[in-house]
């Protein structure tokens, strides 16, 4: 648990500057870009104390017209921006969170708004920020604050039982003249709780050099174009393989970090760098030519797993028993065959396939690839065939694809029970 919490995280940030920002900078896009790069550099600096690096991986400037309706109603603007991000921006560029920068004044004293505990979520990993000051640092701290909300942090409330011992930290409810780049103990707790509860996966992946669109800064701990390594400032760098002043490897070093970097040299070929997580995963080993561990690879589909209870499918071992347990709890088991006869009817929710409104009943041999049936506890003479479905998700409550339906057979994407050797 502690190792999970202490792992380095990378927020790959997309920033959108709207038309009002272009007007504010008199159409000088180069000047506007510089302003934004400075903001991101500050945000990265602020978050390094939490072992988070923030990298700008995309910058979009709406120089002709706004692609959403940006208004003084912060709540509405945030909702439209979240929607646009999910339906448009995410399809064009992969990123973890998107923030809007606008010169439009929001109602009341609001200078920013963001969804809380939403990092990595498709339509809510967003924030909106007003470019409210001539002082770059103040705007940067506003965006850092809104990003804090995405990462699960609530406001530091003074005089509560929580005792957030910091009046001017990043998550203070209002901006004050005393500028602080620090997070309170409450913010740190909120962030750790967010990691534990939501387990956001997207921020575990490091951006590649070419993903980062801002000019390289030696000493920001991000590996960028033109750098061989980046271990932070000369004062804080603890890495003997990297020269902090130049971001080049020290003499005789082959690498500065990586799962296959050992004491500044590439690990020997064949050294295991990622153990197999389970039956359907493969262990990876170093090549001897690189500091990176090869891409995480999976066992082939159809390989027996969990003592022949199932067959691997896309890195998982789908078996009906586990599906029943996930729906009904630990005393659930797979129902007897007689329950699966409902799938032969092709009525209501009992079928193998549904295309538009047409329902296709299961053939006798495929009945265990349709709706899943489970029983709870010991069964007496009367069997209660439990099943579940959802109006919103047609696959919910169906037997998972790749599940073993008979010895040597699995459910394919057409929900037919077919030979495992020819299924994939």
Curated annotation (Swiss-Prot):
Report the residue ranges where the short sequence motif D/ECD-tripeptide is annotated in this entry.
Answer: 279-281
- Which Gene Ontology CC terms are recorded? extracellular region; plasma membrane
Q: Which Pfam families match?
A: ADAM_CR (PF08516), Disintegrin (PF00200), Reprolysin (PF01421)
| GO MF terms, alphabetically ordered | metal ion binding; metalloendopeptidase activity; toxin activity
Looking at the record, the residues that make up the Peptidase M12B domain are 9-207
Where along the chain is Ca(2+) 1 bound?
96, 202, 205
- For the ligand (Ca(2+) 3), the binding residues are 281, 284, 296
- State the active site: 146
Q: Which SUPFAM superfamilies match?
A: Blood coagulation inhibitor (disintegrin) (SSF57552), Metalloproteases ('zincins'), catalytic domain (SSF55486)
Q: Which PROSITE patterns match?
A: ADAM_MEPRO, DISINTEGRIN_1, DISINTEGRIN_2, ZINC_PROTEASE
Expression tissues: Expressed by the venom gland.
Report residues binding Zn(2+). Answer: 145, 149, 155
Task: Report the top EC class in one word.
Answer: hydrolase
Protein EC: 3.4.24.-
Residues listed as glycosylation sites in the UniProt record: 69, 185, 331
Task: Give the cofactor binding note.
Answer: Binds 1 zinc ion per subunit.
- The protein's predominant localisation is secreted
Which post-translational modifications are recorded for this protein? Glycosylated.
Which segments constitute the Disintegrin domain? 215-301
What is the activity regulation comment for this entry? Its proteolytic activity is inhibited by EDTA, TPEN, 1,10-phenanthroline, and some thiol compounds, but is enhanced by alkaline earth metal ions (Mg2+, Ca2+, Sr2+, and Ba2+). Its activity is not modulated by urea (4 M).
Q: What else is known?
A: Negative results: does not show hemorrhagic activity.
Question: Which PANTHER family does the UniProt entry name for this protein?
Answer: ADAM A DISINTEGRIN AND METALLOPROTEASE DOMAIN, DISINTEGRIN AND METALLOPROTEINASE DOMAIN-CONTAINING PROTEIN 28
Subunit-structure text: Monomer.
* Known function: Non-hemorrhagic metalloproteinase that degrades fibrinogen. The alpha chain (FGA) is rapidly degraded, the beta chain (FGB) is degraded very slowly, while the gamma chain is left intact. Shows a prefential cleavage at X-Leu bonds. Cleaves insulin B chain at '29-His-|-Leu-30', '33-Ser-|-His-34', '38-Ala-|-Leu-39' and '40-Tyr-|-Leu-41' bonds.
The family this protein is said to belong to: Belongs to the venom metalloproteinase (M12B) family. P-III subfamily. P-IIIa sub-subfamily.
What is this protein identified as? Zinc metalloproteinase-disintegrin-like brevilysin H2a
Q: Which organism is it from?
A: Gloydius brevicauda (Korean slamosa snake)
Which lineage ranks, top first, belong to the organism behind this chain?
A: Eukaryota, Metazoa, Chordata, Craniata, Vertebrata
């Amino acid at each position: 648990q502690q190792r999970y919490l202490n792992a380095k995280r990378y927020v790959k940030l997309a920033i959108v500057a709207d038309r009002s920002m272009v007007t504010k900078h008199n159409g000088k896009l180069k000047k506007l870009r510089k302003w934004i790069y400075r903001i991101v550099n500050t945000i990265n600096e602020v978050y390094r104390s939490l072992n988070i690096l923030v990298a700008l991986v995309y910058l979009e400037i709406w120089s002709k017209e706004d692609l959403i309706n940006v208004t003084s109603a912060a709540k509405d603007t945030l909702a439209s921006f979240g929607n646009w991000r999910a339906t448009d921006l995410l399809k064009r560029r992969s990123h973890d969170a998107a923030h809007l920068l606008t010169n439009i004044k929001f109602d009341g004293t609001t200078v920013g708004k963001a969804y809380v505990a939403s990092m990595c979520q498709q339509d809510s990993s967003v924030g909106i920020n007003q470019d409210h000051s001539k002082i770059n640092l103040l705007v940067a701290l506003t965006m850092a604050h809104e990003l804090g909300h995405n990462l699960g942090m609530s406001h530091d409330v003074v005089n509560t039982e929580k005792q957030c011992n910091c009046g001017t930290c990043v998550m203070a409810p209002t901006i004050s003249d005393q500028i602080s780049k620090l997070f309170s103990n409450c913010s740190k707790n909120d962030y750790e709780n967010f990691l534990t509860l939501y387990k956001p996966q997207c921020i575990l992946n490091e951006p590649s050099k070419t993903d980062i669109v801002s000019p390289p800064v030696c000493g920001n701990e991000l590996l960028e174009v033109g750098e061989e390594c980046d271990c932070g400032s000369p004062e804080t760098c603890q890495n003997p393989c990297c020269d902090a002043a130049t971001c080049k490897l020290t003499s005789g070093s082959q690498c500065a970090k990586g799962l296959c970097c050992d004491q500044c040299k590439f690990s020997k070929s064949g050294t295991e760098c990622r153990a197999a997580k389970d039956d359907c995963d493969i262990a990876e080993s170093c090549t001897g030519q690189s500091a990176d561990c090869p891409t995480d690879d999976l066992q082939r589909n159809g390989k027996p797993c969990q003592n022949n209870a199932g067959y691997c499918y896309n890195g998982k071992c789908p078996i009906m028993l586990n599906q029943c347990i996930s729906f009904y709890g630990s005393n659930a088991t797979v129902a007897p065959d007689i329950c699966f006869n409902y799938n032969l009817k092709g009525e209501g929710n009992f079928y193998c396939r549904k295309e538009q409104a047409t329902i296709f009943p299961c053939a006798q041999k495929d009945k265990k690839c349709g709706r899943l049936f489970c029983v709870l506890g010991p069964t007496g003479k009367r069997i209660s065939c439990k099943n579940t479905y959802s109006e919103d998700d047609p696959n919910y409550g169906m037997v998972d694809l790749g599940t073993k339906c008979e010895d040597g057979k699995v459910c394919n994407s057409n929900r037919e029970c077919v030979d495992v050797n020819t299924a994939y």
